[in-house]
Amino acid sequence: MQDQLRADECCKYLKALGEPERLRIVECLQGGPKTVSEISRDIGSAIANVSHHLKQLRFAGLVCGERSGRNVIYSLSPAFAGKAAGKAPLKVLDFGCCRIELGKK
């Protein structure tokens, strides 16, 4: 039963990352917190499109947002994002069932 719950939870995260635009957003946020406008500019996508995908990433728990005046500053969820040992620019999303390395070429 526990394995089934863990698999279901992991699938939720992987499904959220299954859209190329969402993966680009997560990769963009590995550089640090950003507003929707900054993300939109950095990945070359419309603000409305970025907002839609951020909503899905927030729902899955991969991204969190904090209001700052009129803006919301988005960042990778601390529960999943961390530095890989010895490789400062590389970020890892650790879901417990699997790990995804971002920024590795």
Regions found by a protein language model. Give the residues of each.
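Amphipathic alpha-helical dimerization/coiled-coil segments
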Residues: 1-5, 9, 78-105
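N-terminal helix-turn-helix DNA-binding core of bacterial DNA-binding proteins
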Residues: 9-46, 72-81
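A generic structural signal for short beta-strands and their flanking turns/coil linkers
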Residues: 32-35, 61, 70, 96
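Short, hydrophobic-biased segments on the C-terminal half of alpha helices
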Residues: 54-55
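Beta-hairpin "wing" of winged helix-turn-helix
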Residues: 59-68, 75-76
